[in-house]
């Protein structure tokens, strides 16, 4: 998207370096972008106007919320052709996938990893996004759960409760993998396992809910 990338990466690196030299906590920060998927994404990466996560092979991208890109598969193929592993941010929030949840399966079959938002499980983005997030999680179609926080807000105090609920939903081993093990593998630029998944199925009530405009 023209004009979408406004972050000065050199400035961000400088800020990060200053924080690291002056910090008085054990919090570790890593540089990376959540990148809007565009046809010239590989050019932006080569020009350092967009970067992978922590200078690894993993690239976090997002889609428009209202219109499904026509050439999304071509753009994903181009990313992978450059040796990068695409991670789709907050897939549960793209309502144009709700009627055909097999789209998520096709992404994962192509090697795309999916990163869900903590806030979605708490209803922050509406009941449909919450239901979709739960379905993706239960179907083994999620590889990360993250905050998607771009600025200070009220999400952090809610995360322990959300994690408790998620542990009850699918088990603490699974949640630990999505919030701790896989993110650490990413930071080390190691491969992340894509496990066997099951098909997403709706009951009649869920289907009516997800098909509404």
What are these regions (language model features)?
Residues 123-125, 153-157, 187:
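Short active-site-adjacent structural elements
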Residues 164-213:
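Mid-to-C-terminal alpha-helical segments outside catalytic/metal-binding sites
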Residues 6-9, 25-28, 154-182:
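Short acidic, glycine/proline-enriched helix-loop-strand junctions
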Residues 5-115, 193-213:
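Extended substrate/RNA-proximal surfaces in nucleic-acid metabolism proteins
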